[in-house]
Swiss-Prot record:
The lineage of its organism: Eukaryota, Metazoa, Chordata, Craniata, Vertebrata. Residues 51-64 have a biased composition (Polar residues). This is Ubiquitin conjugation factor E4 B. The keyword Transferase applies. It comes from Mus musculus. One of its GO terms (molecular function) is enzyme binding. Ubiquitin-protein ligase that probably functions as an E3 ligase in conjunction with specific E1 and E2 ligases. May also function as an E4 ligase mediating the assembly of polyubiquitin chains on substrates ubiquitinated by another E3 ubiquitin ligase. May regulate myosin assembly in striated muscles together with STUB1 and VCP/p97 by targeting myosin chaperone UNC45B for proteasomal degradation.
Length: 1173
C-alpha cells in the first residue's frame, strides 16, 4: 500500500470532521501531559470522502486566522451572553456577531441545552461511553426543529467560535484573552500541520492553558481575564443562588473569579428573636473555594463549559447545524474530561480519596452550569477506578458539610440538594451515583456498641443528611437563633414556626429524592431497604417509656426518616400488602422476643408461625409494597409517638415549674425574713431560668411536631393501618357487622399490641393539640375501628389498651374538647354503635375493677370517670337512650354497674371530705400566726407539704366523686328497681346516710376551707344531689333500708338536713316537704324495729354465714361445699366473680339452694320469737 503524504493525511482528517461524525472511538486515550504544546499529529486517519464545509486548513494562514486580540475581545457589559460570529476575519467579534445575527434567527431555543450531554473526547484519558439510541433520536429531533436558514459555518468562523469560548489567541496578546505561545509558534512554523481536526485543536488549547496555569503565580494565564458571563461571578446575584464564594485575595488571583463575599441574609434569619448575624465561620470551610492552581483550572473549565450553553442560546439555529453542534459537543466533552484530570490531580499532583474534592464548594454554592455535574458522571462512570477517585471525595465532602450545617440558616439544604442531584443522575436504567453511595464502607456500618441507633446516625453515610432537626435537644443553635430574644411574641413564634416547617419540608423533599433514587435503581434497592430496616431495628429501644437518648437516634432524625417513608408509602394499595409479613421468616423487622401481642402469648405466636410457614418452604419473597408499608408503620412507632410523649412530658414540667414559681411568689411574705430566704430566692431564680429554657424548647417542638401537613400524613397512614386490621377482623369490610365472631382471628391476635395502642396515642395527641387535623377522608375508618374495638373488648387482652380507646372517645367529647364535637357525633351516630356501645362500656366499667396491675385500685377511678362522662353525652342521644333503658331493665350487668357506682362514691366522697378536713386544720393553724410561728421550722415545712398533698388529692378525688354522684343522680331519676335489690339497697342507703352525716352532722364545720371552688368543692350542690337521690328512690323498701342503717342514720341528722336546705334555699318547699315525709316514714320503721327487736346472737354456728358471721336467711351451697347466705355471696360476686374461700371462678348460676337448712333456720327463728314474747 502506497504511503500517504502528510497533506493527504490532513485532507482526509478534515473531510472526516466535515462529515459530522456520530460516533467516537471507544479506546481510551490519554491527553499528553507535557509542558510544551502538542506537536503535529503522527497517526494517519482512514481515507474518507472529502466534503466541503469550508473548514479546510489549507486556506488558513496566520494572517487570515481569527486569532488576534480583537477576534476574541468581549465587551465588558457582555455578561448576559456571547453573540454569534460572522465570517469576516478582519473585524472584531462584536462586529462579526452583528453580521452573523442578521442571517440567523435569534430566538432562544430552550432545548439547546440538551445538546450538552455529549461523548467524551479521546484525549481525556477516560473511557468513552456509548450514547443511548434514545439520546441520538432526541438530538436528531431537536436538530430538525430549527433547520438552518443561513449559510453553513466556515472553518474560519468555527475557529473564531473556539477562540471565543476558550478566550484564547495565538496571534496577539491582550488582557481579555490568554495568549498561547506554543500554539502560536506552531502556526507560524507550519499552519497546515498544527492540528488534525477540531478535537485535536481543542485538546491542544486546553492542555496548553492548563499547563500554563501550573507555572508560578507570576505567570498565571487567567490574571488578564475580566469577569463576563461566568456563573461563578453571577451566582451571588442570582435570586436562587444566594451564596457567594470565598476565593481569598491575592495579587495573583484572576479578577474573573469572585473574591471574598458573604452569604446573603436568609429570610428566615430576620424572623429570629435574637436577630444575630449568620454564623459564616461554621460553614466557610465547605462553602469556600480554595485559592490554588487546581481551582484556577476548574474555574476556567467551568466557564468554558458555560459559554457553550450561552452560544447555543444566543444562536440556536447556527448551533443546530451538525458541524457546529458536534464542535460544541466536543468542547463540552473536553472541558469535562480535563476537569476529571484536574480532580484526579493528573495535571498537578495525584490526590488520595481522603483529600477533599475541589468541586464540593461549587456544588454547595449551586453555581455549576446546567448539566456539568451530570456530564461528569456520564463521562467517568464506566471507568470504576476513575469514577471512585473523582466522586468518593465529593461524597465525603458533602457528608462533612451536611454534618456541620444546621437549621439555624438555610445553608443546610445545599448538601442535600447536591447529593439529590447526583443520585438522580440516570443513564438508561442505571443510577451510577446510587451504586457508588451504596457501595461505600459506611453505607451500613456494623454496630460496635449497645447504642446502635445513635451509631447509625453518626457513622452511616446518609446519617449526616438525615440529622437536621428543629428540636432544641438535637440542635441548640436553632433555639438560640430564633427563640432566645428578650420578648418572644406569639405572632413572632407562629411566623418562625411556619418558616422552620417550610425549611423542614424542603430538606425532607431532598431526602426523599435521594432515597427514592436509590430504591429506583435496581442494583441498590436491596441496600436501601436494608438500611431503612437497620435504622428501625437499631432504634427499637426508642419506644420504651424511659429510653436512654444516648443509645438511640434523635427525634429529628427519626421524624425525617418517617417523612421519607410516608412519601414512599403514599401510593401503596392495601390489596398488595401482606398482613402476615411480620411473621414472615424473611421479615426485615426484628421484634423483641418479649413484644406484647394484642391477644396472644409467645406460644400462640409460635404456633401461628408454624401454621403459616412450617410446611411451605420455599417461602415467597415479600414484595416491596409490603416491606415499605411495615417499615413505615414501625417508623411511626419509633418517631412520632416518642416525640409526642416527650412533648407532653415537657408541658407537664412547664406546668409544675409554673406552679412552683407561683407558690414561691405567693408565699414570699412568709419566707423573705426567714433564715431560708436566700435559699428560696436562689430556688426562684433557678426555676425561672429553667422555665424560660423549657418554654423555648417547647417553641422549637411546636415547629417540629405541630406541623399540620405532617400530622395529616401520619393520620392518613394510621387510617391505612386501621383498614388493614379491619380487613383481618372482618373480610367483608367495609360491610362490618357486630358482634364479631367470638373466636379472635389468629393473625389479629398475634399482631404487636402497639399497632392498636399507637393509633389511640396518636389520636389522643392530635385531639389535644391539633384537633383541626382530625377531619380527613380516613376519619370514617377511624370511627369504625374505635366502635368495633370498644364493642368487642374480648379481642384485646390488655384492659389498659381498651382504657386508652375509651380515653380517646372521652377526649373527643364536646364537654372536654369542643373542637371535636363532629368526631364524637360520628361515633355516637355510627350504625354499629347504637346497640352495643352502651352495654360494652357498662361491662368495661365493672371489668376494670380488676386489671392485674398493682395500681388497679386507683386506675379504675379515672377510667370510670371517662366512661361516666361518655354516658352523660350518649344519654342525650335518642338512638342510645333506648339502649340505656333496655340495659337498665335487663338485670345482671346493670346491677354490677350500680354496685361499682356505690363502691366508688363511698370511697371517693370519703377521701375527698377527709382531705378537706385536713386542709381546714392546717389553714386554721396558719391563721393563728402567733401559734404558727412557734412551731419548729421543719414542722412548718412538713405541715405545708402535707397541705399541698391534700390539696392535690382533694382536687382529683372531688372531680371523680362529682362525676360519680352526677351519674347516680341521673340513673336514679330514670330507673329505681335495680337500686332496691337486697344486695344493693342497704349498702346504697348506708352510703347516702354517711355522706349526709359528713355534710350536715356535728363535724360539718371541719369541711369549711378557704376558696372551696379551688378544689371543686360545692357543698350545696352535693347536698342537693344526695337528697334528690333519696326522693327519687322514695318507697317503703328504701325507707326500711335507711332505717336499718344503725351506723349513720339518726332522726336528728334528717332534721338538720331539712333545716339547712330551708336556710340555704337548696330545694323548693314542695321538695323539702317530700323529704320530711320520707324522714317520718323512716322514723316509724325505726320505732317498729325497736319494738320487735329480737337477739339472734346465740344462733348455732351452722346457721351463721361464715363470711359475715350473721344469721342466714337464704342459705346456698357453693361448688366448694361452703354454705353462705345468698345476699352476702351475691354482694361479693358483684365485686369479684370468685369463691371468697378458694378464689375459683364463681357465678350466681353455680349457687345451689339448701332448702332443708333454710327451713331449720326459719323454725329456729319462730321458736326464738315465741320464747321472747
Amino acid at each position: 500500500m502506497e504511503e500517504l503524504s502528510a497533506d493527504e493525511i490532513r485532507r482526509r482528517r478534515l473531510a472526516r470532521l466535515a462529515g459530522g461524525q456520530t460516533s467516537q472511538p471507544t479506546t481510551p486515550l490519554t491527553s499528553p501531559q507535557r509542558e510544551n504544546p502538542p506537536g503535529p499529529p503522527i497517526a494517519a486517519s482512514a481515507p474518507g470522502p472529502s466534503q466541503s464545509l469550508g473548514l479546510n486548513v489549507h486556506n488558513m494562514t496566520p494572517a487570515t486566522s481569527p486569532i488576534g486580540a480583537a477576534g476574541v475581545a468581549h465587551r465588558s457589559q457582555s455578561s448576559e451572553g456571547v453573540s454569534s460570529l460572522s465570517s469576516s476575519p478582519s473585524n472584531s467579534l462584536e462586529t462579526q456577531s452583528q453580521s452573523l445575527s442578521r442571517s440567523q434567527s435569534m430566538d432562544i431555543d430552550g432545548v439547546s441545552c440538551e445538546k450538552s450531554m455529549s461523548q467524551v473526547d479521546v484525549d481525556s484519558g477516560i473511557e468513552n461511553m456509548e450514547v443511548d439510541e434514545n439520546d441520538r433520536r432526541e438530538k436528531r429531533s431537536l436538530s430538525d426543529k430549527e433547520p438552518s436558514s443561513g449559510p453553513e459555518v466556515s472553518e474560519e468562523q468555527a475557529l473564531q467560535l473556539v477562540c471565543k469560548i476558550f478566550r484564547v489567541s495565538w496571534k496577539d496578546r491582550d488582557r481579555d484573552v490568554i495568549f498561547l505561545s506554543s500554539l502560536s509558534a506552531q502556526f507560524k512554523q507550519n499552519p497546515k500541520e498544527v492540528f488534525s481536526d477540531f478535537k485535536d485543536l481543542i485538546g491542544q488549547i486546553l492542555m496548553e492553558v492548563l499547563m500554563m496555569s501550573t507555572q508560578t503565580r507570576d505567570e498565571n494565564p487567567f490574571a488578564s481575564l475580566t469577569a463576563t458571563s461566568q456563573p461563578i461571578a453571577t451566582a451571588a446575584r442570582s435570586p436562587d443562588r444566594n451564596l457567594m464564594l470565598n476565593t481569598g485575595s491575592s495579587s495573583g488571583t484572576s479578577p474573573m473569579f469572585c473574591n471574598m463575599g458573604s452569604f446573603s441574609t436568609s429570610s428566615l434569619s430576620s424572623l429570629g428573636a435574637s436577630g444575630g448575624a449568620s454564623n459564616w465561620d461554621s460553614y466557610s470551610d465547605h462553602f469556600t473555594i480554595e485559592t490554588c492552581k487546581e481551582t484556577d483550572m476548574l474555574n476556567y473549565l467551568i466557564e468554558c463549559f458555560d459559554r457553550v450553553g450561552i452560544e447555543e442560546k444566543k444562536a440556536p439555529k447556527m448551533c443546530s447545524q451538525p458541524a457546529v453542534s458536534q464542535l460544541l459537543s466536543n468542547i463540552r466533552s473536553q472541558c469535562i474530561s480535563h476537569t476529571a484530570l484536574v480532580l484526579q490531580g493528573s495535571l498537578t499532583q495525584p490526590r488520595s480519596l481522603q483529600q477533599p474534592s475541589f468541586l464540593v464548594p461549587y456544588m454547595l454554592c449551586r453555581n455549576l452550569p446546567y448539566g456539568f455535574i451530570q456530564e461528569l458522571v456520564r463521562t467517568t462512570h464506566q471507568d470504576e477506578e476513575v469514577f471512585k477517585q473523582i466522586f468518593i471525595p465529593i461524597l465525603q465532602g458533602l457528608a462533612l458539610a451536611a454534618k456541620e450545617c444546621s437549621l439555624e440558616s438555610d445553608y443546610f439544604k445545599y448538601p442535600l440538594m447536591a447529593l439529590g442531584e447526583l443520585c438522580e443522575t440516570k443513564f438508561g436504567k442505571t443510577h451510577p451515583m446510587c451504586n457508588l453511595v451504596a457501595s461505600l464502607p459506611l453505607w451500613l456500618p456494623k454496630s460496635l456498641s449497645p447504642g446502635s441507633g445513635r451509631e447509625l446516625q453518626r457513622l452511616s453515610y446518609l446519617g449526616a443528611f438525615f440529622s437536621f432537626s428543629v428540636f432544641a435537644e438535637d440542635d441548640a443553635k436553632v433555639v438560640e437563633k430564633y427563640f432566645s430574644g428578650p420578648a418572644i411574641t406569639l405572632e413572632n413564634t407562629r411566623v418562625v414556626s411556619q418558616s422552620l416547617q417550610h425549611y423542614l419540608e424542603l430538606g425532607r423533599q431532598e431526602l426523599f429524592k435521594i432515597l427514592h433514587s436509590i430504591l429506583l435503581n435496581g442494583e441498590t434497592r436491596e441496600a436501601a431497604l436494608s438500611y431503612m430496616a437497620a435504622l428501625v431495628n437499631a432504634n427499637m429501644k426508642k419506644a420504651q417509656m424511659q429510653a436512654d437518648d444516648r443509645l438511640v437516634s434523635t427525634d429529628g432524625f427519626m421524624l425525617n426518616l418517617l417523612w421519607v417513608l410516608q412519601q414512599l408509602s403514599t401510593k401503596i394499595k392495601l390489596e398488595t400488602v401482606d398482613p402476615t409479613y411480620i411473621f414472615h421468616p424473611r421479615c426485615r423487622i426484628t421484634l423483641p422476643n418479649d413484644e406484647t401481642r394484642i391477644n396472644a402469648t409467645m406460644e400462640d405466636v409460635n404456633e401461628r408461625l408454624t401454621e403459616l410457614y412450617g410446611d411451605q418452604p420455599p417461602f415467597s419473597e415479600p414484595k416491596f409494597p409490603t416491606e415499605c408499608f411495615f417499615l413505615t408503620l414501625h417508623a411511626h412507632h419509633l418517631s412520632i409517638l416518642p416525640s409526642c410523649r416527650r412533648y407532653i412530658r415537657r408541658l407537664r414540667a412547664i406546668r409544675e415549674l409554673n406552679r412552683t414559681v407561683e407558690d414561691l411568689k405567693n408565699n414570699e411574705s412568709q419566707w423573705k425574713d426567714s433564715p431560708l430566704a436566700t435559699r428560696h430566692r436562689e430556688m426562684l431564680k433557678r426555676c425561672k431560668t429553667q422555665l424560660k429554657k423549657l418554654v423555648r424548647c417547647k417553641a422549637c417542638a411546636d415547629a417540629g411536631l405541630l406541623d399540620e401537613s405532617f400530622l395529616r400524613r401520619c393520620l392518613n397512614f394510621y387510617g391505612l393501618l386501621i383498614q388493614l386490621m379491619l380487613r383481618i377482623l372482618d373480610p367483608a369490610y367495609p360491610d362490618v357487622t357486630l358482634p364479631l365472631n367470638s373466636e379472635v382471628p389468629k393473625v389479629f391476635a398475634a399482631l404487636p399490641e402497639f399497632y392498636v395502642e399507637d393509633v389511640a396515642e396518636f389520636l389522643f395527641f392530635i385531639v389535644q393539640y391539633s384537633p383541626q387535623v382530625l377531619y380527613e377522608p380516613c376519619t370514617q375508618d377511624i370511627v369504625m375501628f374505635l366502635v368495633v374495638m370498644l364493642c368487642n373488648q374480648n379481642y384485646i387482652r390488655n384492659p389498659y389498651l381498651v382504657a386508652k380507646l375509651v380515653e380517646v372517645m372521652f377526649m373527643t367529647n364536646p364537654s372536654v374538647q369542643p373542637r371535636t364535637q363532629k368526631f364524637f357525633e360520628m361515633i355516637e351516630n355510627h350504625p354499629l354503635s347504637t346497640k352495643l356501645l352502651v352495654p360494652s362500656l357498662m361491662k368495661f366499667y365493672t371489668d376494670v375493677e380488676h386489671t392485674g396491675a398493682t395500681s388497679e385500685f386507683y386506675d379504675k377511678f379515672t377510667i370510670r370517670y371517662h366512661i361516666s362522662t361518655i354516658f352523660k353525652s350518649l344519654w342525650q342521644n335518642i338512638a342510645h337512650h333506648g339502649t340505656f333503658m333496655e340495659e337498665f331493665n335487663s338485670g345482671k350487668q346493670f346491677v354490677r354497674y350500680i354496685n361499682m357506682l356505690i363502691n366508688d362514691t363511698t370511697f371517693l366522697l370519703d377521701e375527698s371530705l377527709e382531705s378537706l378536713k385536713r386542709i381546714h386544720e392546717v389553714q386554721e393553724e396558719m391563721k393563728n400566726k402567733e401559734q404558727w410561728d412557734q412551731l419548729p421550722r421543719d414542722q412548718q415545712q412538713a405541715r405545708q407539704s402535707q397541705l399541698a398533698q391534700d390539696e392535690r388529692v382533694s382536687r382529683s378525688y372531688l372531680a371523680l366523686a362529682t362525676e360519680t354522684v352526677d351519674m347516680f343522680h341521673l340513673l336514679t331519676k330514670q330507673v329505681q328497681k335495680p337500686f332496691l335489690r337486697p344486695e344493693l339497697g342497704p349498702r346504697l342507703a348506708a352510703m347516702l346516710n354517711f355522706n349526709l352525716q359528713q355534710l350536715c352532722g356535728p363535724k360539718c364545720r371541719d369541711l369549711k376551707v378557704e376558696n372551696p371552688e379551688k378544689y371543686g368543692f360545692e357543698p350545696k350542690k352535693l347536698l342537693d344531689q344526695l337528697t334528690d337521690i333519696y326522693l327519687q328512690l322514695d318507697c317503703a323498701r328504701f325507707a326500711k333500708a335507711i332505717a336499718d342503717d344503725q351506723r349513720s342514720y339518726s332522726k336528728e341528722l334528717f332534721e338538720e338536713v331539712i333545716s339547712k336546705m330551708r336556710k340555704a334555699g337548696i330545694k323548693s318547699t314542695i321538695a323539702i316537704e317530700k323529704f320530711k315525709l320520707l324522714a317520718e316514714k323512716v322514723e316509724e320503721i325505726v320505732a317498729k324495729n325497736a319494738r320487735a327487736e329480737i337477739d339472734y346472737s346465740d344462733a348455732p354456728d351452722e346457721f351463721r354465714d361464715p363470711l359475715m358471721d350473721t344469721l342466714m336467711t337464704d342459705p346456698v351451697r357453693l361448688p366448694s361445699g361452703t354454705v353462705m347466705d345468698r345476699s352476702i355471696i351475691l354482694r361479693h360476686l358483684l365485686n369479684s366473680p370468685t369463691d371468697p374461700f378458694n378464689r375459683q371462678m364463681l357465678t350466681e348460676s353455680m349457687l345451689e339452694p339448701v332448702p332443708e337448712l333454710k327451713e331449720q333456720i326459719q323454725a329456729w327463728m319462730r321458736e326464738k320469737q315465741s320464747s321472747d314474747h
